[in-house]
């Protein structure tokens, strides 16, 4: 929006009326539990810290608790249909068949859990089959060169991919390869401002508590607010 662009420009130039613009444009509000109620489907909460009541870990736990869709557990972790995710560092190698390849599914790529299925329960080959909607369409994929398959598309035309994560590490894997027993993504209702660099969302909520307000530099704040499209 025009107001949002003006705010970005205001912050970038470090003008004196930044606080006035934040308050007048209804871009700021006192911190209370209402911040945890999603305003948009494509929304993220950005934090500077992991611990504490309004830290990343607690917010992710709370918001996943409020997701009433079906779930599956893997150790201490659990995953629910509808959970937003970010692919992590292991994704860069998890989905390729040759280290010389440029990964198509990579670290810091957005997605959402569409479905999952437990296969071979109780067997040495036990694994979870995940269906993940990613944030872009994939075309002309050579299935022999990737460790996933495109199984469909969302209403917006983005791809839904399917892959499997094994419970046990294969004896065929060596230490140089990413284990197919590592889940290549993390739950991401909330992420760090640093992690959000390069990402965009329709709605962004930035948590600034008294404990960390002095740590929010101009650069960090500008990075955070420019993640929002709307």
Which residues does each predicted region cover?
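Core RecA-like ATPase module of SF1/SF2 helicases and allied nucleic-acid translocases
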Residues: 5-230
């Amino acid at each position: 929006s025009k107001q949002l662009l003006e705010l970005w420009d205001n912050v970038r130039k470090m003008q004196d009326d930044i606080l006035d613009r934040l308050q007048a444009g209804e871009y700021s509000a006192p911190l209370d539990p209402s911040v945890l109620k999603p305003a948009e489907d494509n929304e993220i909460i950005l934090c500077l810290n992991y611990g504490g009541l309004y830290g990343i870990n607690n917010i992710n736990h709370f918001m996943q608790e409020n997701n009433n869709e079906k779930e599956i557990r893997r150790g201490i972790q659990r995953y629910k249909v509808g959970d937003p995710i970010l692919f992590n560092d292991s994704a860069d190698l998890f989905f390729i068949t040759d280290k010389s390849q440029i990964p198509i599914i990579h670290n810091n790529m957005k997605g959402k859990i569409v479905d999952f299925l437990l296969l071979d329960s109780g067997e040495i080959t036990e694994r979870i089959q995940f269906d993940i909607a990613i944030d872009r369409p994939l075309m002309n994929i050579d299935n022999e060169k990737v460790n996933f398959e495109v199984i469909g598309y969302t209403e917006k035309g983005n791809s839904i991919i399917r892959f499997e994560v094994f419970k046990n590490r294969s004896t065929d894997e060596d230490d140089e390869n990413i284990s197919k027993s590592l889940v290549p993504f993390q739950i991401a209702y909330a992420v760090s401002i640093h992690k959000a660099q390069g990402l965009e969302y329709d709605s962004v909520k930035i948590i600034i508590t008294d404990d960390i307000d002095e740590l929010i530099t101009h650069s960090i704040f500008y990075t955070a607010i420019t993640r929002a499209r709307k």
